[in-house]
Amino acid sequence: MRHGDISSSPDTVGVAVVNYKMPRLHTKEQVLENCRNIAKVIGGVKQGLPGLDLIIFPEYSTHGIMYDRQEMFDTAASVPGEETAIFAEACKKNKVWGVFSLTGEKHEQAKKNPYNTLILVNDKGEIVQKYRKILPWCPIECWYPGDKTYVVDGPKGLKVSLIICDDGNYPEIWRDCAMRGAELIVRCQGYMYPAKEQQIAIVKAMAWANQCYVAVANATGFDGVYSYFGHSSIIGFDGHTLGECGEEENGLQYAQLSVQQIRDARKYDQSQNQLFKLLHRGYSGVFASGDGDKGVAECPFEFYKTWVNDPKKAQENVEKFTRPSVGVAACPVGDLPTK
């Protein structure tokens, strides 16, 4: 893991995260013009950072937040579509990979709300991963939720997963990506104040807990409703920050992520190898007791057993110590039911 140079190497993936200024857009043509601006940014960053392999833009960087419901539907994208074609051409032209936001992506059933989607485009202009946000930021966001994570071979073979903003507040999604083999988890977010310190902290903790690289791209600026705090960052698999932006609009950070180092750590580290130890629980004591050398593999967590085997029961259980309705009468949001 290296930070401070503009290069990359056969073993290192050059990654840039962009503090993109949150746009406020209303029409399809405005969205497409913004896509063309993002394409220009890619060309400029590649010129300044010749080692660049992967560039990452924040959630909402393409469409902005459509606070008007009809505008949200009118500007929703198809994948592939006009927006993705612009991004694909920019990646191909500049020989880089890119992560781009689509808020939203049209639902297969036209009357249902769109998805909040990320795409990973390779240096040939091909879409190699499409991820739909599993955990939209309720009660404000009204995206239709996605239902799974993905892992693909990224630049130089580094295994990449995509997650979005509020997803990252749930340890389960990080662990799911990591346990499926992800070595770099990309978190694109449009996160606003007041949650700045919590969001800076959680990505470092999740990198450490899951022995994975983390790249965060966050929005900056004020869109008339929210103020976005930036702090796009790149975190090493040991939880240390390699590079972090401030609140500056359109700032960026860059680091080189070693493919070999993370694989070496996952293979040879012992006391802090959380991924291995979770599925080989207590192996030292089990071995010393003469019960084999693999530890205990069974899941000891009652909540997860219930969730998998009886989701409705798990839902009822959490409502017993939280609340039975999605809305809250003391602070209503829209027309969400409060009883």
From Swiss-Prot:
What is catalysed by this protein? Answer: a monocarboxylic acid amide + H2O = a monocarboxylate + NH4(+)
- What keywords does the record list, in alphabetical order? Hydrolase
Q: Which GO terms describe its molecular function?
A: amidase activity
Report the CDD domains cross-referenced here: aliphatic_amidase
Assigned EC number: 3.5.1.4
Alphabetical list of Gene3D superfamilies matching this protein: Carbon-nitrogen hydrolase
Active site positions, chain numbering:
59 (proton acceptor), 133 (proton donor), 165 (nucleophile)
- The UniProt record lists the CN hydrolase domain at 13-259
Fetch the InterPro entries from UniProt: Aliph_Amidase/BUP (IPR050345), Aliphatic_amidase (IPR023719), C-N_Hydrolase (IPR003010), C-N_Hydrolase_sf (IPR036526)
Question: By its UniProt entry, which SUPFAM superfamilies does this protein fall under?
Answer: Carbon-nitrogen hydrolase
Query: Could you name the domain of life of the organism this protein comes from?
Result: Bacteria
Keyword check for Transmembrane, yes or no.
no
> What is stated as this protein's family in its record?
Belongs to the carbon-nitrogen hydrolase superfamily. Aliphatic amidase family.
User: What the protein does?
Assistant: Catalyzes the hydrolysis of short-chain aliphatic amides to their corresponding organic acids with release of ammonia.
Q: Which PANTHER family match?
A: ALIPHATIC AMIDASE (PTHR43674:SF14), NITRILASE C965.09-RELATED (PTHR43674)
For this entry, the protein name equals Aliphatic amidase
Organism of this sequence? Helicobacter pylori (strain P12)
